[in-house]
A protein has these predicted regions:
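Carbohydrate-interacting regions of secretory-pathway proteins
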Residues: 22, 28, 32, 43-47, ...
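Positively charged n-region of N-terminal signal peptides that target proteins for export
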Residues: 1-6
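Bacterial N-terminal signal peptides
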Residues: 7-16
Length: 326
């Protein structure tokens, strides 16, 4: 008995479906992961950053604490053009690692008996959504723009739902001149430009009243020059929590800001600025996503307004306020 004609085409149909499988988006694969990392030297909880590098490729940066020491590893990921599968491979502790991504998780083997098993998480900064205290000057809330001016004169892409705006052409300046001490809160969201490198990834900037820039950039597992990464005092000082990338150790630019979250996720800066008496320099302390990145850094004091830089990237801002300390 001959099989029905329809059945004869099933293998071809299956091959066609596999050949045109839709790969997961970069947005769904990139991000923070947590889980376990086990190899010949031992087993421990792992924190992992999967960084989108463009054209379906990724960089996996893993770290764990074993026997009181931080151990790091780095492997590469790629997307199969036919199957759409995202796989990772490389050396971890001298052993070959093979892993694959599926539905928000990455799992695989390390050597003969080791394993990597991690799941994607979302880390929310502790001060995200922090309400302005009594007496604070609200610069951006998505509704009232009396205390902030767009240099172009036009506000663009206002999201009334979350109160965010896209940084306007030419940037934006606060209206009131700040003379002395203050606390400032800024929330920002960097766009994803996976094929870009260094300053091309989600670039903007938060200029304090004295015109010292705290850089805004997609620095999630991404390196750049001194002070040029997210949270850096531009071309002057890196954040105090820089993390090395194993393959770049020994090179000039080999670290990234450990406090940085993935692009497309809301992040927060909280800044304390204090003027000192007797002609001494002002002291600035900053937290990035709840992590202290600058501790009483000395800066030249100058009264002025805040500026938020337009650097050709659709970076978004929301919930910006400043509280002057009398």
């Amino acid at each position: 008995m001959k099989p029905p004609i329809a059945l004869l085409f099933l293998p071809l149909l299956s091959l066609s479906i596999l050949a045109n499988a839709k790969p997961p988006t970069e947005e769904s694969v990139q991000g923070l992961y947590e889980g376990s990392w086990k190899d010949a030297t031992g087993s421990a909880d792992a924190e992992v950053r999967v960084v989108a590098m463009g054209k379906g490729t990724f960089k996996l940066l893993a770290r764990r604490k074993l026997d009181g020491k931080i151990v790091r590893a780095e492997i590469d990921g790629k997307t199969d053009a036919k199957s759409g599968d995202v796989t990772f491979g490389g050396s971890i502790g001298g052993a070959n690692c093979k892993a694959s991504y599926k539905h928000g998780a990455i799992a695989g083997t390390i050597g003969k008996k080791g394993s990597l098993s991690i799941k994607r998480i979302k880390r929310t900064p502790p001060t995200l959504g922090k309400k302005p205290p009594a007496g604070a000057i609200v610069l951006i809330d998505g509704k009232n723009f009396d205390n902030m001016k767009a240099r172009s004169g036009e506000w663009i892409h206002i999201d009334k739902k979350d109160g965010s705006i896209q940084v306007p052409k030419g940037g934006m300046n606060s209206v009131k001149k700040i003379e002395g001490d203050y606390d400032a809160h800024v929330e920002f969201n960097c766009n994803l430009r996976s094929t870009a490198r260094s300053q091309g990834r989600g670039n903007s900037g938060f200029y304090l009243a004295n015109r010292q820039e705290i850089q805004v950039l997609d620095s999630f597992g991404a390196v750049t020059y001194l002070g040029g990464g997210c949270g850096g005092l531009y071309k002057y000082k890196n954040p105090d929590v820089m993390e090395p990338i194993p393959s770049l150790v020994g090179k000039k630019d080999a670290t990234f800001n450990f406090a940085s979250l993935p692009p497309l996720q809301w992040q927060a800066y909280d800044v304390e600025y204090r003027v000192q008496k007797g002609g001494k320099k002002a002291l600035m302390t900053a937290h990035h996503n709840g992590i202290k990145i600058h501790d009483k850094v000395e800066l030249n004091h100058k009264a002025g307004t805040f500026h938020f830089q337009d650097h050709g990237n659709p970076v978004r801002y929301r919930n910006i306020w400043v509280l002057e300390k009398k």
